[in-house]
Amino acid sequence: MSKQIVHGDQCRKKIIEGINVVANAVGITLGPKGRCVAIEQSYGPPKITKDGVSVAKAIQLKDKSLNVGAQFVISVASKTADVAGDGTTTATVIADAAVRELNKAEVAGIDIQEVRKGAEKAVEAVIADVRKNSSPVKNEEEIAQVATVSSNGDREIGEKIANAMKQVGQEGVITVEDSKNFNFEVEVVKGMRFDRGYISQYFATNREKMITEFENPYILLLDQKVSTVQPLVPVLEAVAHTGKPLVLIADDVDGEALTALILNNLKGSIKVVAVKAPGFGDRKKEMLEDIAILTNGEVITEQLGIKLEKVNDTSKLGTANRVIVTKDHTTIVHDKNNSDIEKKVNSRCEQIREAIKDTTSDYEKEKLQERLAKLRNGVAVLKVGGATEVEQKERKDRVEDALHATRAAVEEGIVPGGGVALFYASRVLDSLKFDNEDQRVGINIIKKVLEAPVRQIVKNAGGKEDVVVNELSKSNDKNRGFDARTMQYVDMIKAGIVDPTKVVRTALQDAFSVASLVIATSAMITDHEEDNNTGNRSGGGVGGGHHGGMGGMDF
């Protein structure tokens, strides 16, 4: 395929234009009076959302050069979402403003490398000030406030998330799923989460969120590594006959075995996900046993004389109501009404409590307490309903955003919301030292850019940006801000308008990181437009060996 190359000013102009297209679409969602965006789906009704990263990821521009710019800002939103779980719109708005201001400096002939150094110093100083003024989340009401703000002012969402955290603890497991009725409910069920995700992204059933979700799966627990597929064939055939999915938790899965599982998963011969077992050494064996008790299954281990190739039915496999696997975590949700499992779990918890009493190692005691918490506290499930499928999905998006924001707040604390944390933090730049005048330009650019979130929130509310910015500039109270819902100046903390420190910090860091890359770019290479319309390419699949087995499956 032939390529086209764009250099210099024309290159940067196209990139900035592409960034601006995405930023305009994402920016309108910011704040309590931000608007929703309708995203066309490949089938069914459109997706209605205020989630910045969902809006950004949905954008694919026809002009290849503009699309390069769009991808820059999409990467900002995605990275911020991955790290903080929220703040993607703020990051996008800041990145757009930073790129435009940095480009003005370069066009004016100022040494852009020195400008970047000054801007980098400014970002570090602002983040330090934000952290210094952060307050820890102290109670259920503050948790509810964070969740309410992040869910676009939906107090019910805030209260439900706070209630869920109260029941399972601030570090407990909380999942979000569709309700079968109109209501929004919190239910605590038996289950656990451990810090291991899928071995390959090809197992993801939801490509947009890159997660695997299985309803009523079988769970195969292996205390061994699997490299060849042949020992797995009997149990895979047994599960395939039931039509249910399979969660395989093992020391590791690689080589031929991994290839065959991916191939059959993609073909739909059997729904399967492979996950590495949590822990190491003896602790791994104990955690596998914990999972076995919770799922009413057995750990397949040759130490007990059980060989994998001899497992040819589902009798030794565990079960669960639901399993959710991401790249980092696996969550198992079980029926809380199963009395047999309840008894086994209680007995197992008592064993762990005795082990805690007997150990003299602080480290060992900590790990035992973690295991006890996983078994005892269960999983809080937020069941989100709605009058229509579109309404339900939109609300579910807001619940997930609010949950991410709440976790970030618990982790690093909270600061005044509405964009004022960054706005007031910019005052530290007035006394920041610089090596030359070009660096001072960079510092002043960041000072101006930090007004962008406040301006966007006011703009979306139909207010006058300059008037609000001017009014806040006169204030000596760092908690004073503009409540876009009431169009009044208030004490943001007292009004319950707060942002997680981690979200604010990450948004600024990621935005500046991408803005720096953009301004350092002087050429781009894209496909020629006419080449994109010539014929269809057949995508390569995942190869796999054929070693016999049931029809329709590749082993």
Swiss-Prot record:
GO terms for cellular component: cytoplasm. ATP binds at residues 29-32, 50, 86-90, 418, 499. The keyword Metal-binding does not apply. Forms a cylinder of 14 subunits composed of two heptameric rings stacked back-to-back. Interacts with the co-chaperonin GroES. GO terms for molecular function: ATP binding; ATP-dependent protein folding chaperone; isomerase activity; unfolded protein binding. This is Chaperonin GroEL. It comes from Orientia tsutsugamushi (strain Ikeda). GO terms for biological process: protein refolding. The gene is groEL.
